[in-house]
UniProtKB/Swiss-Prot annotation:
This is Argininosuccinate synthase. It is found in: Cytoplasm. One of its GO terms (cellular component) is cytoplasm. Homotetramer. Its EC number is 6.3.4.5. Keywords: Amino-acid biosynthesis, Arginine biosynthesis, ATP-binding, Cytoplasm, Ligase, Nucleotide-binding. The gene is argG.
Amino acid sequence: MASHKDVKKVVLAYSGGLDTSIILKWLQTELGAEVVTFTADLGQGEELEPARKKAEMLGIKEIYIEDVREEFVKDFVFPMFRANAVYEGVYLLGTSIARPLISKHLIDIARKTGADAIAHGATGKGNDQVRFELSAYALNPDIKIIAPWRDWSFKSRTDLLEFAEKHQIPVAKDKKGEAPFSVDANLLHSSSEGKVLEDPAQEAPEYVHMRTISPEAAPDKATIIKVGFERGDAVSIDGVRMSAATLLAKLNEYGRDNGIGRLDLVENRFVGMKSRGVYETPGGTILLSAHRAIESITLDRGAAHLKDELMPRYAELIYYGFWFSPEREMLQAAIDKSQEHVEGEVTLKLYKGNVMVVGRESGKSLYSDKLVTFEDDQGAYDQKDAAGFIKLNALRLRTLAARNR
């Protein structure tokens, strides 16, 4: 166990769930530390007052519950979507992108309250411990960090349940009377891990899905929507302007009702192991398709291809926890520069788990029907010019062929 004897006051990232409630009591009983709780409203869709009441029941005097939904979407989710960031080809980074924001607020509250440490409930096997701590150290290099899962003697969730029963800490149950899946949720996504999901050969039970209906149960009639963009960010739906968080919440509703955004994947964790999770990102899945569509008519080919080359590295930085790193900020500057003329409107058809782009328009469009038409282009393009273009590009290939024959 790491030595934390000199820690007097700790700010705990507190959800009110099993892990963090046990941690709260453990910090009090094992370290004798004064605990401050921070609960972020990230749009997880849960009432936060139970977390406050639970903290009060456990003797906490300083309780911070903050609505960070707009900050989350505007300053973290939207910048990430400007890059079309996807980890390992499929994962829209819904958990990853929330961690630096939580760390930022933990550091801010520690400064306000005079706390000398922060604590989190991430396990020693996962990515979140890295994300929380890299972000915290980037913002305050001297902060002390307590990660109880790496320090205490508990080895399983069963051990935690026994501790909770001993200390009369209430634990939520699922419909089957068991402790719930390991769940993370915010306005962008929800994820479920553990129990039967640990067997990647077994299909996830339907009750695991919290954010979407099944595609099979979705309406037989398609839903048509239009998403408007300015400088790479979504600003409106069907011509109605709305705030960042409100817009994403509305897209979530459309995605939920049409069975969009389900993902069952096995991913490579930063710490070296593979894990299986069931993710739901209804609004984000729609947003990604819409953003790529508006870029298709407003981005120059060279810029678009360079963005696609940079994206995997950018996504990896977020997944690994390097949001506040200089390299992520460098890439962000380039990505944001590329978005200066990414504006317009995209029409989407949503149908039984599918997002289909059926129209796109922009006042900054680079698409020219005069250039591309199969009909008379009235001199807009001279097809004879292609001969020289091909000859020059073929020069090295012909030279190689002549040598090798």
